[in-house]
Amino acid sequence: MLENDIKKVLVSHDEITEAAKKLGAQLTKDYAGKNPILVGILKGSIPFMAELVKHIDTHIEMDFMMVSSYHGGTASSGVINIKQDVTQDIKGRHVLFVEDIIDTGQTLKNLRDMFKEREAASVKIATLLDKPEGRVVEIEADYTCFTIPNEFVVGYGLDYKENYRNLPYIGVLKEEVYSN
């Protein structure tokens, strides 16, 4: 049972759903008539993005990128590897990155800078979780659902070695699970 590896539930499924509803309402107002491209960062953003888009009541397009900066461990390497780029030309378009968590900030800072170079009309960031204590670069999300302490979290898309993504909540992983 996956629950046996969880120290505590940090954010419940109901809290995530409610936060996605509120954020969806805000994005509906902010992007009305702009037809933004929501870019989900794979793989972790899938559950959050799927919940979020159900609550956005304006035209949007969706695309995805697969970018890695974690290489099987618990700390970001700082090296950004784009495994899959967006399929659309974003020049002149409003782009909203949808992310599961901002930790060091390196991945999103690099992506934001890259999309500005591609001449996007605007580049903003929405994240389910923000962990400011982990930040090593200057970057802030434009939309944040939850600010969390500097603990190793899994669930709702977040993983440890590709496991735990399917938990319906955000939980703190027991240290003995990842320290071995």
UniProtKB/Swiss-Prot annotation:
Q: In which pathway does it act?
A: Purine metabolism; IMP biosynthesis via salvage pathway; IMP from hypoxanthine: step 1/1; Purine metabolism; GMP biosynthesis via salvage pathway; GMP from guanine: step 1/1
Q: Which keywords does this Swiss-Prot/TrEMBL entry list? A: Cytoplasm, Glycosyltransferase, Magnesium, Metal-binding, Nucleotide-binding, Purine salvage, Transferase
EC number per UniProt: 2.4.2.8
The protein's matches in Pfam families, at most eight in alphabetical order, are given as:
Pribosyltran
Active-site residue list: D103
Say where the protein is mainly found. Answer: cytoplasm
Q: Select a single GO molecular function from the record's annotations and give it.
A: guanine phosphoribosyltransferase activity
Residues reported in the UniProt entry to bind GMP: K131, F152, V153, D159
Q: Where in the cell is it found?
A: Cytoplasm
Q: Which cofactor does it need?
A: Mg(2+)
List cellular component terms (GO): cytosol
Q: Which InterPro entries match?
A: HGPRT (IPR050408), Hxn_phspho_trans (IPR005904), PRibTrfase_dom (IPR000836), PRTase-like (IPR029057)
Q: Which residues bind diphosphate?
A: K43, G44, R165
**Any one of the GO BP annotations:** hypoxanthine metabolic process
Q: Where does Mg(2+) bind?
A: E99, D100
Q: Which reaction does it catalyse?
A: IMP + diphosphate = hypoxanthine + 5-phospho-alpha-D-ribose 1-diphosphate; GMP + diphosphate = guanine + 5-phospho-alpha-D-ribose 1-diphosphate
Top EC group: transferase
Job of this protein: Purine salvage pathway enzyme that catalyzes the transfer of the ribosyl-5-phosphate group from 5-phospho-alpha-D-ribose 1-diphosphate (PRPP) to the N9 position of the 6-oxopurines hypoxanthine and guanine to form the corresponding ribonucleotides IMP (inosine 5'-monophosphate) and GMP (guanosine 5'-monophosphate), with the release of PPi.
Similarity-based family: Belongs to the purine/pyrimidine phosphoribosyltransferase family.
| Annotated protein name in UniProt | Hypoxanthine-guanine phosphoribosyltransferase
Q: Which organism is it from?
A: Streptococcus pneumoniae (strain ATCC BAA-255 / R6)
What are the leading ranks of the lineage? Bacteria, Bacillati, Bacillota, Bacilli, Lactobacillales
